[in-house]
Protein backbone atom coordinates (compact mmCIF):
# COMPACT_ATOMS: atom_id res chain seq x y z
CA UNK A 1 0.00 0.00 0.00
CA UNK A 2 1.70 3.16 -1.23
CA UNK A 3 1.52 6.27 0.94
CA UNK A 4 -1.09 8.86 0.03
CA UNK A 5 1.66 11.48 -0.26
CA UNK A 6 2.86 9.88 -3.50
CA UNK A 7 -0.54 10.21 -5.13
CA UNK A 8 -1.93 13.58 -4.07
CA UNK A 9 -1.07 15.52 -7.23
CA UNK A 10 -2.42 12.80 -9.50
CA UNK A 11 -5.62 12.43 -7.50
CA UNK A 12 -6.26 16.17 -7.47
CA UNK A 13 -5.71 16.31 -11.23
CA UNK A 14 -8.22 13.51 -11.83
CA UNK A 15 -10.76 15.09 -9.48
CA UNK A 16 -10.48 18.35 -11.45
CA UNK A 17 -10.70 16.61 -14.82
CA UNK A 18 -7.15 17.59 -15.79
CA UNK A 19 -6.17 13.94 -15.86
CA UNK A 20 -8.30 10.93 -16.72
CA UNK A 21 -9.40 8.22 -14.31
CA UNK A 22 -8.47 4.58 -14.67
CA UNK A 23 -11.90 3.43 -13.49
CA UNK A 24 -15.30 5.08 -13.11
CA UNK A 25 -18.14 3.36 -11.29
CA UNK A 26 -21.43 4.79 -12.54
CA UNK A 27 -25.02 4.56 -11.35
CA UNK A 28 -24.39 3.29 -7.84
CA UNK A 29 -26.05 3.92 -4.50
CA UNK A 30 -23.24 5.02 -2.20
CA UNK A 31 -23.25 3.67 1.35
CA UNK A 32 -21.73 6.56 3.27
CA UNK A 33 -20.27 5.31 6.55
CA UNK A 34 -19.44 8.93 7.36
CA UNK A 35 -22.98 10.32 7.32
CA UNK A 36 -24.98 7.13 7.81
CA UNK A 37 -26.95 7.54 4.60
CA UNK A 38 -27.35 5.97 1.18
CA UNK A 39 -26.78 8.41 -1.69
CA UNK A 40 -28.32 7.31 -4.96
CA UNK A 41 -26.99 8.30 -8.37
CA UNK A 42 -23.36 8.46 -7.25
CA UNK A 43 -20.28 8.10 -9.47
CA UNK A 44 -16.81 7.16 -8.25
CA UNK A 45 -13.59 7.92 -10.14
CA UNK A 46 -10.50 5.87 -9.33
CA UNK A 47 -6.89 6.62 -10.26
CA UNK A 48 -4.33 3.94 -9.53
CA UNK A 49 -5.25 2.32 -6.24
CA UNK A 50 -7.09 5.34 -4.77
CA UNK A 51 -10.35 7.20 -5.16
CA UNK A 52 -10.08 10.65 -6.74
CA UNK A 53 -13.69 11.78 -6.99
CA UNK A 54 -17.06 10.92 -5.43
CA UNK A 55 -20.15 12.77 -6.61
CA UNK A 56 -23.09 12.87 -9.00
CA UNK A 57 -21.11 13.11 -12.25
CA UNK A 58 -17.59 11.88 -13.00
CA UNK A 59 -17.77 12.46 -16.75
CA UNK A 60 -15.08 15.15 -16.53
CA UNK A 61 -12.61 12.43 -15.46
CA UNK A 62 -13.51 10.08 -18.30
CA UNK A 63 -10.95 9.40 -21.00
CA UNK A 64 -10.41 6.99 -23.85
CA UNK A 65 -8.66 4.52 -21.58
CA UNK A 66 -11.05 4.77 -18.65
CA UNK A 67 -12.80 1.54 -17.66
CA UNK A 68 -16.51 2.17 -17.06
CA UNK A 69 -18.38 -0.03 -14.62
CA UNK A 70 -22.16 0.41 -14.65
CA UNK A 71 -23.32 -0.59 -11.17
CA UNK A 72 -26.97 -0.69 -12.27
CA UNK A 73 -28.09 0.81 -8.99
CA UNK A 74 -26.09 -1.59 -6.82
CA UNK A 75 -24.94 -0.42 -3.41
CA UNK A 76 -21.30 0.69 -3.28
CA UNK A 77 -19.95 -0.13 0.18
CA UNK A 78 -16.41 -0.14 1.58
CA UNK A 79 -14.69 -3.50 1.81
CA UNK A 80 -15.17 -5.22 5.15
CA UNK A 81 -12.31 -5.85 7.57
CA UNK A 82 -11.62 -8.57 10.13
CA UNK A 83 -9.62 -6.70 12.81
CA UNK A 84 -8.53 -9.82 14.69
CA UNK A 85 -8.07 -13.17 13.00
CA UNK A 86 -5.57 -15.98 13.44
CA UNK A 87 -4.81 -16.75 9.82
CA UNK A 88 -2.31 -19.51 10.67
CA UNK A 89 -5.05 -22.12 10.92
CA UNK A 90 -6.40 -24.73 8.51
CA UNK A 91 -5.67 -23.08 5.12
CA UNK A 92 -2.95 -20.95 3.58
CA UNK A 93 -3.33 -17.17 3.41
CA UNK A 94 -3.93 -17.49 -0.34
CA UNK A 95 -6.86 -19.86 0.14
CA UNK A 96 -8.27 -17.72 2.94
CA UNK A 97 -7.96 -14.50 0.94
CA UNK A 98 -9.74 -15.99 -2.05
CA UNK A 99 -12.71 -17.00 0.07
CA UNK A 100 -12.78 -13.83 2.17
CA UNK A 101 -12.89 -11.48 -0.80
CA UNK A 102 -15.83 -13.42 -2.26
CA UNK A 103 -17.66 -12.38 0.91
CA UNK A 104 -16.59 -8.74 0.63
CA UNK A 105 -13.90 -8.96 3.32
CA UNK A 106 -10.95 -7.18 1.78
CA UNK A 107 -8.67 -6.62 4.80
CA UNK A 108 -7.49 -9.14 7.39
CA UNK A 109 -5.49 -8.29 10.49
CA UNK A 110 -3.35 -11.33 11.21
CA UNK A 111 -2.15 -12.40 14.66
CA UNK A 112 0.04 -15.43 13.79
CA UNK A 113 0.52 -16.82 17.29
CA UNK A 114 0.85 -20.47 16.35
CA UNK A 115 3.18 -19.87 13.41
CA UNK A 116 5.49 -18.01 15.78
CA UNK A 117 4.95 -20.63 18.48
CA UNK A 118 6.25 -23.29 16.10
CA UNK A 119 8.98 -21.39 14.26
CA UNK A 120 9.66 -18.06 15.95
CA UNK A 121 10.64 -15.02 13.90
CA UNK A 122 11.32 -17.20 10.88
CA UNK A 123 7.72 -18.37 11.02
CA UNK A 124 6.49 -14.78 11.33
CA UNK A 125 8.41 -13.68 8.23
CA UNK A 126 7.31 -16.78 6.33
CA UNK A 127 3.64 -16.12 6.97
CA UNK A 128 4.11 -12.48 5.95
CA UNK A 129 5.66 -13.59 2.66
CA UNK A 130 2.81 -16.04 2.06
CA UNK A 131 0.33 -13.17 2.57
CA UNK A 132 1.69 -10.90 -0.17
CA UNK A 133 -0.01 -10.00 -3.46
CA UNK A 134 -3.29 -11.77 -2.73
CA UNK A 135 -6.90 -10.76 -3.54
CA UNK A 136 -7.38 -9.48 0.02
CA UNK A 137 -4.85 -7.34 1.86
CA UNK A 138 -3.17 -8.57 5.04
CA UNK A 139 -1.88 -6.54 7.97
CA UNK A 140 0.12 -8.14 10.75
CA UNK A 141 0.79 -7.83 14.45
CA UNK A 142 3.59 -9.31 16.53
CA UNK A 143 2.15 -12.02 18.81
CA UNK A 144 1.76 -10.56 22.28
CA UNK A 145 0.82 -13.69 24.18
CA UNK A 146 3.93 -15.85 24.03
CA UNK A 147 4.89 -17.49 26.22
CA UNK A 148 1.53 -17.60 27.98
CA UNK A 149 3.20 -18.63 31.24
CA UNK A 150 6.97 -18.95 31.24
CA UNK A 151 6.89 -21.35 34.18
CA UNK A 152 5.29 -24.05 32.03
CA UNK A 153 5.24 -22.85 28.44
CA UNK A 154 7.85 -23.92 25.92
CA UNK A 155 6.46 -22.05 22.93
CA UNK A 156 8.78 -20.10 20.68
CA UNK A 157 8.48 -16.33 20.73
CA UNK A 158 10.30 -13.26 19.41
CA UNK A 159 13.32 -11.77 21.11
CA UNK A 160 13.32 -8.04 21.96
CA UNK A 161 15.54 -7.43 18.94
CA UNK A 162 13.19 -9.38 16.68
CA UNK A 163 10.19 -7.42 17.99
CA UNK A 164 11.92 -4.17 17.12
CA UNK A 165 12.80 -5.49 13.67
CA UNK A 166 9.27 -6.74 13.08
CA UNK A 167 7.53 -3.43 13.71
CA UNK A 168 9.80 -1.84 11.13
CA UNK A 169 8.47 -4.14 8.41
CA UNK A 170 5.77 -2.99 5.96
CA UNK A 171 2.22 -3.74 7.09
CA UNK A 172 3.23 -4.67 10.65
CA UNK A 173 1.07 -2.47 12.86
CA UNK A 174 2.03 -3.42 16.40
CA UNK A 175 1.34 -6.16 18.93
CA UNK A 176 -1.39 -8.78 18.97
CA UNK A 177 -3.52 -9.77 21.92
CA UNK A 178 -1.59 -9.66 25.18
CA UNK A 179 -3.02 -12.86 26.67
CA UNK A 180 -1.96 -12.76 30.27
CA UNK A 181 -3.36 -9.55 31.71
CA UNK A 182 -1.86 -10.68 35.02
CA UNK A 183 1.56 -10.04 33.49
CA UNK A 184 0.54 -6.40 33.18
CA UNK A 185 -1.03 -6.09 36.62
CA UNK A 186 2.05 -7.75 38.17
CA UNK A 187 4.41 -5.65 35.98
CA UNK A 188 6.22 -8.63 34.50
CA UNK A 189 9.51 -7.13 33.21
CA UNK A 190 9.51 -8.87 29.83
CA UNK A 191 5.90 -7.99 29.12
CA UNK A 192 6.36 -4.36 30.14
CA UNK A 193 9.48 -4.11 27.99
CA UNK A 194 7.63 -5.43 24.94
CA UNK A 195 4.71 -3.08 25.51
CA UNK A 196 7.14 -0.20 25.91
CA UNK A 197 8.78 -1.08 22.60
CA UNK A 198 5.40 -0.94 20.88
CA UNK A 199 4.40 2.35 22.48
CA UNK A 200 7.73 3.95 21.61
CA UNK A 201 7.21 2.82 18.03
CA UNK A 202 3.75 4.39 17.86
CA UNK A 203 2.15 0.97 17.48
CA UNK A 204 -1.28 -0.44 18.24
CA UNK A 205 -1.51 -3.05 21.02
CA UNK A 206 -4.46 -5.44 21.03
CA UNK A 207 -5.91 -6.84 24.22
CA UNK A 208 -7.28 -10.02 25.75
CA UNK A 209 -9.02 -9.24 29.04
CA UNK A 210 -11.12 -12.32 29.80
CA UNK A 211 -11.74 -12.31 33.55
CA UNK A 212 -10.37 -8.81 34.19
CA UNK A 213 -12.47 -6.07 35.76
CA UNK A 214 -12.22 -3.16 38.17
CA UNK A 215 -8.73 -2.05 39.10
CA UNK A 216 -7.17 -4.95 37.18
CA UNK A 217 -8.80 -3.82 33.97
CA UNK A 218 -7.76 -0.21 34.64
CA UNK A 219 -4.16 -1.31 35.15
CA UNK A 220 -4.26 -3.19 31.86
CA UNK A 221 -5.71 -0.26 29.93
CA UNK A 222 -3.19 2.11 31.51
CA UNK A 223 -0.48 0.20 29.63
CA UNK A 224 -1.82 1.55 26.34
CA UNK A 225 -3.78 -1.56 25.37
CA UNK A 226 -6.93 -0.21 23.79
CA UNK A 227 -8.98 -3.09 22.37
CA UNK A 228 -10.45 -6.41 23.42
CA UNK A 229 -12.35 -9.18 21.67
CA UNK A 230 -13.13 -11.16 24.84
CA UNK A 231 -16.35 -9.54 26.14
CA UNK A 232 -19.15 -12.10 26.12
CA UNK A 233 -22.01 -9.76 27.08
CA UNK A 234 -23.01 -6.10 26.96
CA UNK A 235 -22.00 -5.45 30.56
CA UNK A 236 -18.40 -6.48 29.89
CA UNK A 237 -18.35 -4.54 26.62
CA UNK A 238 -19.65 -1.42 28.32
CA UNK A 239 -17.07 -1.59 31.11
CA UNK A 240 -14.31 -1.63 28.51
CA UNK A 241 -15.85 1.13 26.41
CA UNK A 242 -16.12 3.35 29.48
CA UNK A 243 -12.37 2.97 29.98
CA UNK A 244 -11.68 4.15 26.45
CA UNK A 245 -11.21 0.73 24.86
CA UNK A 246 -12.53 -0.43 21.52
CA UNK A 247 -14.54 -3.66 21.52
CA UNK A 248 -14.29 -6.28 18.80
CA UNK A 249 -17.50 -8.30 18.94
CA UNK A 250 -16.48 -11.87 18.29
CA UNK A 251 -18.45 -14.00 15.87
CA UNK A 252 -16.21 -16.85 14.80
CA UNK A 253 -15.79 -20.59 14.88
CA UNK A 254 -14.84 -20.87 18.55
CA UNK A 255 -17.19 -18.31 20.12
CA UNK A 256 -20.14 -16.24 18.95
CA UNK A 257 -20.88 -13.30 21.26
CA UNK A 258 -22.61 -10.80 18.98
CA UNK A 259 -26.16 -11.61 20.08
CA UNK A 260 -25.30 -11.01 23.74
CA UNK A 261 -23.43 -7.74 23.18
CA UNK A 262 -25.09 -5.78 20.41
CA UNK A 263 -28.83 -5.47 21.23
CA UNK A 264 -28.34 -3.73 24.61
CA UNK A 265 -25.72 -1.43 23.08
CA UNK A 266 -28.11 -0.51 20.26
CA UNK A 267 -30.85 0.20 22.77
CA UNK A 268 -28.56 2.56 24.69
CA UNK A 269 -26.97 3.93 21.51
CA UNK A 270 -23.74 3.78 23.49
CA UNK A 271 -20.25 3.42 22.06
CA UNK A 272 -21.42 2.28 18.64
CA UNK A 273 -18.54 4.04 16.88
CA UNK A 274 -16.09 1.95 18.91
CA UNK A 275 -17.63 -1.44 18.14
CA UNK A 276 -16.22 -3.76 15.48
CA UNK A 277 -16.81 -7.32 14.32
CA UNK A 278 -14.08 -9.95 14.39
CA UNK A 279 -13.88 -13.71 13.98
CA UNK A 280 -10.83 -14.50 16.13
CA UNK A 281 -10.38 -17.31 13.63
CA UNK A 282 -12.80 -19.05 11.29
CA UNK A 283 -12.69 -22.60 9.99
CA UNK A 284 -13.40 -23.55 6.36
CA UNK A 285 -16.73 -25.19 7.17
CA UNK A 286 -18.08 -22.07 8.85
CA UNK A 287 -16.71 -19.85 6.09
CA UNK A 288 -18.49 -21.93 3.48
CA UNK A 289 -21.78 -22.10 5.36
CA UNK A 290 -22.00 -18.66 6.97
CA UNK A 291 -19.48 -16.38 5.28
CA UNK A 292 -16.96 -14.05 6.86
CA UNK A 293 -17.58 -10.50 8.15
CA UNK A 294 -20.66 -10.34 5.89
CA UNK A 295 -22.21 -12.87 8.27
CA UNK A 296 -21.58 -10.49 11.17
CA UNK A 297 -23.27 -7.66 9.27
CA UNK A 298 -26.32 -9.79 8.50
CA UNK A 299 -26.54 -10.86 12.14
CA UNK A 300 -26.21 -7.27 13.33
CA UNK A 301 -29.10 -6.17 11.10
CA UNK A 302 -31.17 -9.12 12.29
CA UNK A 303 -30.47 -8.00 15.87
CA UNK A 304 -31.75 -4.51 15.13
CA UNK A 305 -28.84 -2.52 13.69
CA UNK A 306 -29.38 -0.08 10.85
CA UNK A 307 -27.70 -1.56 7.74
CA UNK A 308 -25.42 1.43 7.18
CA UNK A 309 -24.42 1.41 10.86
CA UNK A 310 -23.61 -2.30 10.59
CA UNK A 311 -21.47 -1.67 7.50
CA UNK A 312 -19.60 1.07 9.39
CA UNK A 313 -18.87 -1.38 12.21
CA UNK A 314 -17.47 -3.76 9.59
CA UNK A 315 -15.29 -1.13 7.92
CA UNK A 316 -14.77 2.43 9.16
CA UNK A 317 -14.63 1.59 12.87
CA UNK A 318 -11.84 -0.94 12.32
CA UNK A 319 -9.62 1.48 10.43
CA UNK A 320 -10.37 4.28 12.88
CA UNK A 321 -9.06 2.00 15.63
CA UNK A 322 -5.91 1.08 13.72
CA UNK A 323 -5.22 4.76 12.90
CA UNK A 324 -5.64 4.02 9.20
CA UNK A 325 -8.71 6.16 8.47
CA UNK A 326 -6.77 8.31 6.00
CA UNK A 327 -6.35 5.29 3.77
CA UNK A 328 -9.18 2.83 4.37
CA UNK A 329 -12.60 2.36 5.89
CA UNK A 330 -14.89 4.31 3.59
CA UNK A 331 -15.52 5.48 0.05
CA UNK A 332 -14.20 9.02 -0.28
CA UNK A 333 -11.50 10.95 -2.18
CA UNK A 334 -7.96 9.99 -1.25
CA UNK A 335 -8.83 6.61 0.19
CA UNK A 336 -7.82 3.23 -1.18
CA UNK A 337 -10.41 1.92 -3.63
CA UNK A 338 -11.53 -1.16 -1.70
CA UNK A 339 -15.14 -1.17 -2.88
CA UNK A 340 -17.79 -3.87 -3.02
CA UNK A 341 -20.97 -3.66 -5.06
CA UNK A 342 -23.79 -5.20 -3.02
CA UNK A 343 -27.00 -6.58 -4.49
CA UNK A 344 -28.98 -5.36 -1.48
CA UNK A 345 -28.70 -4.33 2.16
CA UNK A 346 -30.23 -7.57 3.43
CA UNK A 347 -28.05 -10.38 2.13
CA UNK A 348 -24.98 -8.10 1.80
CA UNK A 349 -23.87 -10.34 -1.03
CA UNK A 350 -21.32 -8.68 -3.33
CA UNK A 351 -21.62 -8.94 -7.09
CA UNK A 352 -18.29 -7.23 -7.71
CA UNK A 353 -15.37 -6.47 -5.41
CA UNK A 354 -12.54 -4.05 -6.15
CA UNK A 355 -9.36 -4.09 -4.07
CA UNK A 356 -7.05 -1.16 -4.66
CA UNK A 357 -9.07 -0.34 -7.77
CA UNK A 358 -8.53 -3.79 -9.27
CA UNK A 359 -11.53 -6.03 -9.80
CA UNK A 360 -11.07 -9.21 -7.78
CA UNK A 361 -14.64 -10.50 -7.94
CA UNK A 362 -17.01 -10.20 -10.91
CA UNK A 363 -20.52 -11.59 -10.92
CA UNK A 364 -19.86 -13.23 -7.57
CA UNK A 365 -16.85 -15.17 -8.85
CA UNK A 366 -13.14 -14.70 -8.23
CA UNK A 367 -11.47 -13.31 -11.36
CA UNK A 368 -8.05 -12.28 -10.07
CA UNK A 369 -5.11 -14.49 -10.88
CA UNK A 370 -3.13 -15.62 -7.88
CA UNK A 371 0.57 -16.36 -7.76
CA UNK A 372 0.95 -17.09 -4.05
CA UNK A 373 4.28 -17.60 -2.36
CA UNK A 374 4.58 -21.27 -1.46
CA UNK A 375 5.58 -22.40 1.99
CA UNK A 376 9.31 -23.22 2.10
CA UNK A 377 10.32 -26.84 2.46
CA UNK A 378 11.48 -26.49 6.08
CA UNK A 379 7.86 -25.89 7.15
CA UNK A 380 7.13 -29.55 6.38
CA UNK A 381 9.79 -30.80 8.77
CA UNK A 382 8.66 -29.46 12.14
CA UNK A 383 7.81 -32.78 13.78
CA UNK A 384 10.99 -34.08 15.36
CA UNK A 385 9.73 -37.36 16.76
CA UNK A 386 10.31 -40.94 15.71
CA UNK A 387 7.72 -43.73 15.46
CA UNK A 388 5.63 -44.22 18.57
CA UNK A 389 4.45 -47.49 20.05
CA UNK A 390 1.89 -48.45 22.68
CA UNK A 391 4.69 -48.43 25.26
CA UNK A 392 5.10 -44.68 24.82
CA UNK A 393 1.60 -44.22 26.27
CA UNK A 394 2.12 -46.34 29.37
CA UNK A 395 1.51 -45.04 32.90
CA UNK A 396 3.43 -47.36 35.20
CA UNK A 397 2.25 -48.74 38.52
CA UNK A 398 3.00 -51.73 40.73
CA UNK A 399 -0.48 -51.75 42.24
CA UNK A 400 -3.65 -53.51 41.10
CA UNK A 401 -5.59 -50.24 40.93
CA UNK A 402 -4.59 -46.58 40.98
CA UNK A 403 -6.34 -43.37 41.92
CA UNK A 404 -5.52 -40.86 39.20
CA UNK A 405 -6.11 -37.17 38.67
CA UNK A 406 -8.04 -36.46 35.48
CA UNK A 407 -8.88 -33.62 33.13
CA UNK A 408 -12.67 -33.52 32.96
CA UNK A 409 -13.98 -31.92 29.79
CA UNK A 410 -16.99 -29.67 30.44
CA UNK A 411 -16.99 -28.34 26.88
CA UNK A 412 -14.51 -28.65 24.03
CA UNK A 413 -12.58 -25.86 25.76
CA UNK A 414 -13.48 -25.70 29.46
CA UNK A 415 -11.96 -28.19 31.87
CA UNK A 416 -11.94 -29.00 35.55
CA UNK A 417 -9.94 -31.40 37.68
CA UNK A 418 -11.46 -34.80 38.36
CA UNK A 419 -10.37 -38.17 39.65
CA UNK A 420 -10.90 -41.81 38.81
CA UNK A 421 -9.91 -45.24 40.06
CA UNK A 422 -8.45 -47.32 37.27
CA UNK A 423 -7.25 -50.87 36.86
CA UNK A 424 -3.60 -51.76 36.38
CA UNK A 425 -2.71 -54.50 33.92
CA UNK A 426 0.85 -55.75 33.50
CA UNK A 427 2.17 -52.67 35.25
CA UNK A 428 0.24 -50.17 33.10
CA UNK A 429 -2.66 -48.04 34.34
CA UNK A 430 -5.40 -48.59 31.77
CA UNK A 431 -8.08 -46.23 30.49
CA UNK A 432 -11.70 -47.25 31.02
CA UNK A 433 -14.03 -46.97 28.06
CA UNK A 434 -16.97 -48.05 30.26
CA UNK A 435 -16.33 -45.09 32.59
CA UNK A 436 -15.44 -42.71 29.74
CA UNK A 437 -11.91 -42.27 31.09
CA UNK A 438 -9.34 -41.81 28.35
CA UNK A 439 -5.62 -41.57 28.19
CA UNK A 440 -4.24 -38.25 26.99
CA UNK A 441 -0.64 -37.55 26.05
CA UNK A 442 1.32 -34.47 25.03
CA UNK A 443 4.63 -34.83 23.16
CA UNK A 444 7.23 -32.17 22.43
CA UNK A 445 7.35 -32.28 18.65
CA UNK A 446 9.58 -29.25 18.10
CA UNK A 447 12.83 -29.40 20.03
CA UNK A 448 13.87 -33.00 19.46
CA UNK A 449 14.25 -33.77 23.17
CA UNK A 450 11.40 -36.29 23.14
CA UNK A 451 9.67 -34.92 26.23
CA UNK A 452 6.18 -36.16 26.99
CA UNK A 453 3.52 -36.53 29.65
CA UNK A 454 0.75 -39.14 29.72
CA UNK A 455 -2.35 -38.49 31.81
CA UNK A 456 -6.08 -39.16 31.87
CA UNK A 457 -9.15 -37.37 30.52
CA UNK A 458 -12.89 -37.78 31.15
CA UNK A 459 -16.10 -37.07 29.24
CA UNK A 460 -15.05 -37.26 25.60
CA UNK A 461 -17.63 -39.91 24.88
CA UNK A 462 -16.80 -41.07 21.36
CA UNK A 463 -16.57 -44.73 20.45
CA UNK A 464 -13.20 -44.36 18.76
CA UNK A 465 -9.75 -45.68 19.44
CA UNK A 466 -7.81 -42.41 19.33
CA UNK A 467 -7.62 -38.78 18.20
CA UNK A 468 -4.27 -37.08 17.53
CA UNK A 469 -3.42 -33.47 16.61
CA UNK A 470 -0.17 -31.65 15.88
CA UNK A 471 -1.98 -28.31 16.25
CA UNK A 472 -2.60 -27.09 19.78
CA UNK A 473 -2.85 -23.59 21.30
CA UNK A 474 -0.12 -22.28 21.61
CA UNK A 475 2.45 -24.88 22.54
CA UNK A 476 1.82 -26.99 19.44
CA UNK A 477 2.61 -30.20 21.22
CA UNK A 478 1.49 -33.40 19.55
CA UNK A 479 -1.61 -34.18 21.61
CA UNK A 480 -3.14 -37.66 21.54
CA UNK A 481 -6.17 -38.97 23.40
CA UNK A 482 -7.59 -42.44 23.20
CA UNK A 483 -9.07 -45.55 24.73
CA UNK A 484 -6.35 -47.83 23.36
CA UNK A 485 -2.60 -47.28 23.56
CA UNK A 486 -2.09 -49.19 20.30
CA UNK A 487 -4.55 -46.97 18.46
CA UNK A 488 -3.10 -43.84 20.09
CA UNK A 489 0.27 -44.77 18.60
CA UNK A 490 -1.36 -45.40 15.23
CA UNK A 491 -3.10 -42.00 15.24
CA UNK A 492 0.08 -40.19 16.28
CA UNK A 493 2.13 -41.94 13.59
CA UNK A 494 -0.51 -41.13 10.96
CA UNK A 495 -0.18 -37.45 11.85
CA UNK A 496 3.61 -37.61 11.67
CA UNK A 497 3.49 -39.40 8.32
CA UNK A 498 1.67 -36.37 6.88
CA UNK A 499 4.05 -33.86 8.45
CA UNK A 500 1.21 -32.73 10.71
CA UNK A 501 -2.53 -32.88 10.97
CA UNK A 502 -5.47 -34.31 12.89
CA UNK A 503 -6.25 -38.03 12.72
CA UNK A 504 -8.98 -40.33 14.05
CA UNK A 505 -8.44 -44.07 14.46
CA UNK A 506 -11.33 -46.52 14.80
CA UNK A 507 -11.03 -50.29 15.08
CA UNK A 508 -7.39 -50.20 14.11
CA UNK A 509 -7.67 -48.05 11.00
CA UNK A 510 -7.42 -44.34 10.25
CA UNK A 511 -11.04 -43.34 9.60
CA UNK A 512 -10.48 -39.59 9.18
CA UNK A 513 -7.40 -37.52 8.44
CA UNK A 514 -6.97 -33.77 7.98
CA UNK A 515 -3.40 -33.08 6.82
CA UNK A 516 -1.79 -29.91 8.18
CA UNK A 517 1.55 -30.13 6.41
CA UNK A 518 2.79 -26.57 6.97
CA UNK A 519 4.34 -26.35 10.44
CA UNK A 520 1.78 -28.92 11.57
CA UNK A 521 -0.93 -26.23 11.73
CA UNK A 522 -1.85 -25.24 8.14
CA UNK A 523 -2.90 -27.42 5.22
CA UNK A 524 -1.35 -27.01 1.79
CA UNK A 525 -4.54 -28.39 0.23
CA UNK A 526 -7.25 -26.30 -1.50
CA UNK A 527 -9.96 -24.70 0.61
CA UNK A 528 -12.69 -27.09 -0.51
CA UNK A 529 -10.65 -30.17 0.27
CA UNK A 530 -9.78 -28.87 3.73
CA UNK A 531 -13.44 -28.08 4.39
CA UNK A 532 -14.45 -31.59 3.36
CA UNK A 533 -11.71 -33.07 5.53
CA UNK A 534 -12.79 -31.10 8.59
CA UNK A 535 -16.44 -32.02 8.02
CA UNK A 536 -15.57 -35.70 7.82
CA UNK A 537 -13.38 -35.48 10.90
CA UNK A 538 -16.26 -33.95 12.84
CA UNK A 539 -18.95 -36.32 11.57
CA UNK A 540 -16.85 -39.41 12.27
CA UNK A 541 -16.50 -38.42 15.93
CA UNK A 542 -20.02 -37.09 16.49
CA UNK A 543 -21.52 -40.14 14.78
CA UNK A 544 -19.43 -42.22 17.19
CA UNK A 545 -21.12 -40.50 20.13
CA UNK A 546 -18.71 -37.70 21.00
CA UNK A 547 -20.08 -35.40 23.68
CA UNK A 548 -19.12 -32.26 21.74
CA UNK A 549 -20.05 -30.69 18.40
CA UNK A 550 -16.47 -29.66 17.53
CA UNK A 551 -14.38 -32.56 18.81
CA UNK A 552 -11.20 -31.42 17.05
CA UNK A 553 -11.03 -28.48 19.47
CA UNK A 554 -10.43 -30.77 22.46
CA UNK A 555 -6.75 -31.52 21.68
CA UNK A 556 -6.33 -28.00 20.30
CA UNK A 557 -7.24 -26.40 23.65
CA UNK A 558 -5.85 -28.98 26.08
CA UNK A 559 -2.42 -27.25 26.36
CA UNK A 560 -3.87 -23.69 26.34
CA UNK A 561 -2.52 -22.01 29.47
CA UNK A 562 -4.56 -18.82 29.02
CA UNK A 563 -7.68 -20.62 30.25
CA UNK A 564 -8.40 -22.46 33.50
CA UNK A 565 -8.62 -24.96 34.97
CA UNK A 566 -6.44 -27.99 34.11
CA UNK A 567 -4.19 -28.26 31.05
CA UNK A 568 -1.65 -30.76 29.80
CA UNK A 569 1.66 -30.02 28.11
CA UNK A 570 4.61 -32.26 27.43
CA UNK A 571 6.10 -30.96 30.69
CA UNK A 572 3.12 -32.10 32.78
CA UNK A 573 -0.45 -31.56 33.92
CA UNK A 574 -0.95 -27.99 35.10
CA UNK A 575 -3.37 -26.34 37.52
CA UNK A 576 -3.58 -22.97 35.76
CA UNK A 577 -5.04 -20.98 38.66
CA UNK A 578 -2.54 -22.25 41.22
CA UNK A 579 0.31 -22.22 38.70
CA UNK A 580 1.45 -25.64 39.82
CA UNK A 581 1.87 -29.10 38.38
CA UNK A 582 -0.64 -31.84 39.17
CA UNK A 583 0.58 -35.42 39.59
CA UNK A 584 -1.02 -37.92 37.23
CA UNK A 585 -1.08 -40.54 39.99
CA UNK A 586 -2.89 -39.03 42.97
CA UNK A 587 -0.46 -38.39 45.81
CA UNK A 588 2.67 -38.76 43.70
CA UNK A 589 5.42 -36.13 43.89
CA UNK A 590 5.65 -33.46 41.19
CA UNK A 591 8.74 -31.68 42.50
CA UNK A 592 10.75 -31.10 39.36
CA UNK A 593 8.25 -32.52 36.86
CA UNK A 594 11.05 -33.21 34.42
CA UNK A 595 9.53 -34.42 31.17
CA UNK A 596 10.13 -38.06 30.33
CA UNK A 597 12.29 -38.59 27.29
CA UNK A 598 11.75 -40.90 24.36
CA UNK A 599 14.61 -42.75 22.82
CA UNK A 600 13.33 -42.71 19.25
CA UNK A 601 13.88 -39.03 18.52
CA UNK A 602 13.74 -37.96 14.91
CA UNK A 603 16.29 -35.29 14.12
CA UNK A 604 14.99 -32.26 12.27
CA UNK A 605 16.23 -28.87 11.13
CA UNK A 606 17.76 -26.88 13.95
CA UNK A 607 16.41 -23.72 12.40
CA UNK A 608 12.84 -24.65 13.29
CA UNK A 609 13.40 -23.77 16.93
Swiss-Prot record:
Biological process according to GO: adenine catabolic process
Its EC number(s): 3.5.4.2
Cofactor(s) the protein requires to work: Mn(2+)
Entry's Gene Ontology molecular function annotations: adenine deaminase activity
Keywords from the named record: Hydrolase, Manganese
Domain of life: Archaea
Name of one Pfam family that matches: Amidohydro_1
SUPFAM superfamilies: Composite domain of metallo-dependent hydrolases, Metallo-dependent hydrolases
InterPro entries noted in UniProt: Adenine_deam, Adenine_deam_C, Amidohydro-rel, Metal-dep_hydrolase_composite, Metal_Hydrolase
UniProt KW Nucleotidyltransferase keyword: no
PANTHER family: ADENINE DEAMINASE, N-ACETYLGLUCOSAMINE-6-PHOSPHATE DEACETYLASE
Protein name listed in UniProt: Adenine deaminase
Organism this protein belongs to: Cenarchaeum symbiosum (strain A)
Gene: ade
